[in-house]
Amino acid sequence: MNSTLSTCAGILLLLACQNKQVREQLPVQANDNLIGKIERYDPSAILLIDSNARFEVIGEKYTWSEGPVWLPNENALLFSDVPENKIYQWKEGSGTSLYLTPSGYTDTAKRDGENGSNGLALDKNGRLILCQSGDRTVARLNSPLNDPKPAFTILSANYQGKKFNSPNDLVADSKNNIYFTDPIYGLPEGEKDPTRELKFEGVFRISADGQTSLLIDSIPRPNGIALSADEKTLYVASSDADHPRWFAYQLNEAGQVKSGGILLDATEMKSKATVKQGADGFKLDSIGNIYSAGPDGINIISPEGKRLALIRVYGRSCSNCAFNTDKSNLFITADDIVIKLALHPK
């Protein structure tokens, strides 16, 4: 390369680096391309998400958005605002509206901490099930989805007579067994909260007949949770501040853990991130890839634990995500906003 070409190349490289820095310093704004961008690290990601995937803010001014779930029969999205003890609904054409309150703390006594519902899911009968952070229970909404009322059936409130810490996220299988995580995030004083009864943070299973069993007690800050399509693998995210990780466990026919361990360690990923958060809530696509909130946004991870791509969200911590029915859109809860991401815009 001659000196002139070398100089030009250097200038172009410098400009590219400066432009990249400028883009990453831009504030997050609604309804434009400043919300985030797509970064693909593996050729297979080309089929998963378009580089021009379209970001759109569909809700804003929440305290902490969480736990999104898609309602196929209603063609609607539900999500929690945990500190505000509310669930909101979004529908195409009509926007976002308050869906249910109270959602996770039903007592009238004043209580600090994260009181509302957190993770939301549907059971095999299409009923809404909730992690109630304030009440420290896993519950089911009694009313129809199209006419919600704040009345609940408690599915589990304790393990061996001791109250849960604060159920965080959950998933139901095809037989109506429910798997959920129970970190200390919803306790007003965390680990040292005087009302804490369990000495550990666990991953639990509620059987279809209502029996609660402990599956795992060794994961610090267990958070997001999901099942593989064949329901033979249970995935769990750890949002531990020092060592965020994703775990994969093989289940036996009785739904108990028979083997498993770390799928992907995100410690280094977090150390290099702009938004330094742990692994949080996630969902699986139709071929088993994990779309998980984590360092810098939504990380797309293969079933083998390879990071395929990143849906980078500027300036905000993402908490969870959910697909619509045909998986053309991914909805992302991110701090005070909710994002709709068209994965393959036309």
Residue ranges: model-predicted function:
Residues 18-346:
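Sequence-structural signature of mature extracellular/luminal beta-sheet repeat domains
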Residues 1-25:
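Bacterial Sec-dependent N-terminal signal peptides
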